[in-house]
């Protein structure tokens, strides 16, 4: 287990944590009913890919047609802010400590690693959603799917 994200509350740091969390979280169908991350990550990736071109198109269209620039700029800024909102949410989620029910499940999965003879680094601090994402990613690679039965 790598880390607990620093408690830095900076906006840029939250966005960076969001990117890291987005790369770490396993996109698995079995997790979708319990965690909103799958939907948020898909929407954020879509926004990162398509919103900047949409913003440029909006500005270009308004300038070409001689329309007002103010609403076009507002629309472009809104379109560009959507993926940033997703990254911020993911960053905030990554640094949130796990609630008691997920904390219990987190330790049960770690115990299954121990039963399988796979060494895990000790947990040093209160586990966060980032810690859970790292553990789940490893579990989907190295364990059978029975660890999902306890959810």
Curated annotation (Swiss-Prot):
Keyword Membrane included in the entry's annotation: yes
Pfam families xref list: DUF412
Signal peptide: none
A GO CC annotation given for this chain: plasma membrane
UniProt KW keywords: Cell inner membrane, Cell membrane, Membrane, Transmembrane, Transmembrane helix
TM regions (residue ranges): 46-65, 69-91
Membrane topology: Multi-pass membrane protein
Coiled-coil boundaries: none
Main location: membrane
Cell compartment(s), UniProt: Cell inner membrane
Keyword Cell membrane included in the entry's annotation: yes
NCBIfam families, per database record: PRK01816.1
Family from the record: Belongs to the UPF0208 family.
Protein name: UPF0208 membrane protein YfbV
